[in-house]
Amino acid sequence: MKNLFILLISTILFSSEYPSFTNIEISHIQKKSKIAKNRVIDYSKKIKLFTSYSKEKQLRAVNVYLNRLLPQYDDIITNKENNWATPKEFLTVGYGDCEDYVIIKYYTLIKLGFDDKKLFITVVKEKFKGGSHMVLSYFKTQCSSPLILDNLSFKILPLDKRHDLQAEYFINSTGVFKLSKNLNLLKVADRAKEFEELEEKVKNNL
């Protein structure tokens, strides 16, 4: 009876939209970690709740909800630098580096109906610390300063208000871009290898 209940719950909660989990996957996740299974189910419930929100409220809700998952660096998790985890991998493990937060926010917002052409995985330089970081940019309108979703901040601000960040590259399915002074996106490459590899894994529902 308990197993039947789990199957019914997972069938109801997980749609065909990515990220989706099969009943077999849910069963495997539960065997490894009940916490991970609960996290996966909670994610689906939260996204269903967020569908009734306005776009502005969805941005805030997604940023706050996913930021609450704890960070841990790639070299600790996989012994591989710059490992781009899929949302399913991220949800199963429960933590990740900055790019993993960006990626799950990117696909979650697409799942909620955001235009993927307005969302960009963004490599930035931290002006005061001198290191590299990754955030998600959302261009609400053309030639406007993009809104920044950052795993280090619960507040969403436009890029021109983030004086601590300098945008380097904007990446999505349309290519790799730089931002001009008048806020136009200028294409510098047709594709990014890491993003292509990520998209391939997502297409295979990994």
Q: What is each of the regions a protein language model found here?
A:
Residues 3-13:
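Sec-dependent N-terminal signal peptides
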